C-alpha cells in the first residue's frame, strides 16, 4: 500500500493546480449531502470522494454527519462525526512500520457563546476532537477563541485570539498519536501561516494566533494574523520527509496580511 502523509486539501482537491491562496471552489469526484432543518436544529449527513491528483490518487473517501443546535440566540452547540470507509494511504511510524488510514474515526464537539457577560459583539468559541482507529490510533485536536467585533460601525473591525493544539506522535508509545487533519483547509481559518502551513500543516503543533480584521469597502476585507508555532513532539514523521525530526520545540513565528476582494456574489 501507499505509505504517505495525508495530502493537504490544496494538493488533493480541486485538481493539480488549485491555487489555494486564491480561494478556489472545493470540488469532489462525488458528493452526497442531506440537510434537515427543524427550527433551530440542523442535521446534516454527507459522503465525499475528493478530486485528488490522478498520479497521487489514494482512493480516500469520507462519510459522516453534523448536528448543530442554536439553544438560544446567544448559545450554539454542535457535534461532528467523520469516518474513512476507504483509503489506500498509510501513516509511517518511527520504527519503520505503518498503520492504515482506512477505518479511522473522528468525533468533535463544539460550543459558541455570543455577547459574553453582556458585552455586545464579544464571543467565545471552542471545539475538541478525538480520533481513533481500533487500538492502533489515538489522537486529538482542539481550539479556543475569544474575540470581539463591531459589525455596526465603520469598517466593521474585529479582534480575536485563538489557541489551537494538534497531537503529535510519541515514539515511546505503541499507538499512533499524530492528528489527521482530514479535509481541514480554507484560507480564512485553517491555513495557519502561508509558509508554516506548507512545512507542518495542522498536526503536532500548538499555535497561538492574534487576528485583526476590517472592511474598508463592502467587497474588501483586510486580515492581519500573527502566529506563534510550537511543536508538541520532536518526532514529525508524517510531515515533510526533510523534517522527520526537529531540534527544538520552538519552530517559528509568522505574520500574514491578507486581502479578500469579492468581484461579485457569483
Predicted regions and their residues:
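C-terminal structural cap/anchor segments
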Residues: 158-254
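Signature for the C-terminal beta-barrel architecture of outer-membrane proteins
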Residues: 13-175, 210, 215, 228, ...
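A short alpha-helix capping/helix-coil boundary motif
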Residues: 9-12, 188-190
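Substrate-binding cleft and catalytic face of glycoside hydrolase catalytic domains
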Residues: 1-4, 8, 42-46
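Short, intrinsically disordered, charge-balanced linker/junction segments flanking boundaries
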Residues: 259-266
Amino acid at each position: 500500500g501507499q505509505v504517505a502523509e495525508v495530502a493537504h486539501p490544496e494538493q488533493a482537491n480541486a485538481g493539480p493546480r488549485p491555487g489555494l491562496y486564491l480561494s478556489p471552489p472545493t470540488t469532489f469526484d462525488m458528493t452526497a449531502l442531506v440537510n434537515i432543518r427543524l427550527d433551530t436544529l440542523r442535521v446534516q449527513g454527507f459522503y465525499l470522494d475528493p478530486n485528488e491528483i490522478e498520479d497521487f490518487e489514494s482512493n480516500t473517501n469520507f462519510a459522516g454527519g453534523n448536528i448543530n443546535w442554536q439553544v438560544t440566540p446567544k448559545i450554539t452547540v454542535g457535534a461532528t462525526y467523520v469516518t474513512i470507509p476507504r483509503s489506500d494511504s498509510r501513516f509511517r511510524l518511527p520504527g519503520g512500520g505503518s498503520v492504515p488510514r482506512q477505518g479511522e474515526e473522528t468525533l468533535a464537539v463544539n460550543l459558541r457563546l455570543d455577547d459574553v457577560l453582556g458585552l455586545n459583539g464579544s464571543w467565545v468559541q471552542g471545539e475538541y476532537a478525538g480520533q481513533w482507529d481500533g487500538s492502533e490510533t489515538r489522537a486529538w485536536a482542539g481550539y479556543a477563541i475569544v474575540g470581539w467585533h463591531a459589525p455596526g460601525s465603520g469598517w466593521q473591525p474585529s479582534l480575536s485570539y485563538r489557541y489551537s493544539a494538534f497531537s503529535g506522535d510519541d515514539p515511546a508509545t505503541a499507538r499512533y498519536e499524530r492528528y489527521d487533519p482530514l479535509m481541514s483547509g480554507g484560507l480564512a481559518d485553517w491555513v495557519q501561516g502561508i509558509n508554516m502551513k506548507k512545512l507542518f500543516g495542522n498536526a503536532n503543533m500548538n499555535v497561538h494566533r492574534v487576528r485583526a480584521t476590517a472592511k474598508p469597502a463592502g467587497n474588501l476585507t483586510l486580515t492581519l494574523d500573527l502566529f506563534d508555532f510550537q511543536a508538541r513532539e520532536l518526532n514529525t514523521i508524517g510531515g515533510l520527509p526533510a523534517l522527520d525530526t526537529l531540534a527544538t520545540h520552538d519552530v517559528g513565528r509568522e505574520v500574514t496580511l491578507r486581502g479578500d476582494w469579492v468581484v461579485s456574489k457569483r
